[in-house]
Amino acid sequence: MYMDAFGWSAPAAPCQPSCGPGGDDDDDVLLAAVLGASFELHSLVDGGGNGAAGAVRSDDAYGLDVDLPSHQMSLLRCQDGLSALHGDASPTAAAAAFLDSVDVLPVPAIAGATHDDGGLLDRFAFPNVAETTTVQAAASNTAFSGYSSNTTGGGNISSGESNTYTEVASTPCAVSTTTTTTALPPSKRKLPEKYPVVGTSPTTKTTTTSETAAERRSTKRGAGGSSSITFGGGCHGAGAAAALLGYGRGYEPDTEAIAQVKEMIYRAAAMRPVTLGGPASASDPSSRPPPPPQRPRRKNVRISSDPQTVAARLRRERVSERLRVLQRLVPGGSKMDTATMLDEAASYLKFLKSQLEALETLGNGNGNGNLLHHGYYTGSRNATATAATGSSNSTVLAFGRDGLAGFVKSNRNLQL
């Protein structure tokens, strides 16, 4: 038999309903139906008090040789095959017929049954619910009966089929609902410690790919945006050279040495010939300065003929031309940007003015050979001293009469 093949031959515990409020007179009969390997009535207790006249033979309805009182006639019918049994049918045959189906039939209408007595079986008669509600059976017969009523032949029960049949049968005295909690499948995402965006708490917000990329870009900007390269704490010239030589941030440049170097550079620049495009340059083409580089004309560009636009363009061209001339006059101006070149031009101009004052003093015959009586250039913009002050706290670089003779007597054009 199917029960022995699956190892479910052990009988289930009988379900004994509790007694109602009717007392001992109403609870004369104790009905116990065992669902499993056997289907039999364990005991029937005759309350006595209604007499044999009120008893009806139950073998007409169930095939069991038992006398029931007349006020206990509302019985549940758990199997449609029991109605076809005869009076000599055994409980084993009834159990075999029960195993073929688990459908619930309505309560049979038995003649002489009364529902006003408040008997034990009246509260278990459900004339309307019996057609829609399945009766839950023992756990051992649930899976087999559900499987045998929906499949043909033997075979293994798969996990999908076993999870499908949630409606099971049981005795009418203890109708309960079994809730099965199915655990969630394991997540296929990466580990949270490697990818902190994926959290395990229910309040974790799933971020999109664009948000993650934006966070990464902002992190990179915050890490690399504060880096800067400084040479000598922002000093020009000597500070940058000191940083390149490895003196560090605490290096303090020697201002006197810097002034001396500038004096030497300005002296060499003042003694070189300067050509500004005079009439002599027309006869000597070699002394002509190289023409400015021609910019390629842009295609599909319309040049405006508006007077204001033309005037602004001409003004920009004149400024550019003057900057190019000044770049040739300032020592090292061709290797500087416009702002640095203008700064050096101011320093060079002060040096030239100091030299002019010294030459004018020597030309008037007032000089007695003492170089301290003449103004000199110290390398700084506002560090011009005179002999009256008698200050000698900076480097003095002056020229004597013999030293300046060749420069003064030359026919070079010193007009600026």
From Swiss-Prot:
Residues 317-352 are annotated as: Helix-loop-helix motif. The keyword Nucleus applies. The keyword Transcription regulation applies. It is found in: Nucleus. Residues 176-186, 200-212 have a biased composition (Low complexity). Its main location: nucleus. Keywords: Activator, Nucleus, Transcription, Transcription regulation. Residues 176-226, 276-311 are annotated as: Disordered. Belongs to the bHLH protein family. PANTHER family: TRANSCRIPTION FACTOR HEC3-RELATED (PTHR45914), TRANSCRIPTION FACTOR LATE FLOWERING (PTHR45914:SF40). This is Transcription factor LATE FLOWERING. It comes from Oryza sativa subsp. japonica. The lineage of its organism: Eukaryota, Viridiplantae, Streptophyta, Embryophyta, Tracheophyta.
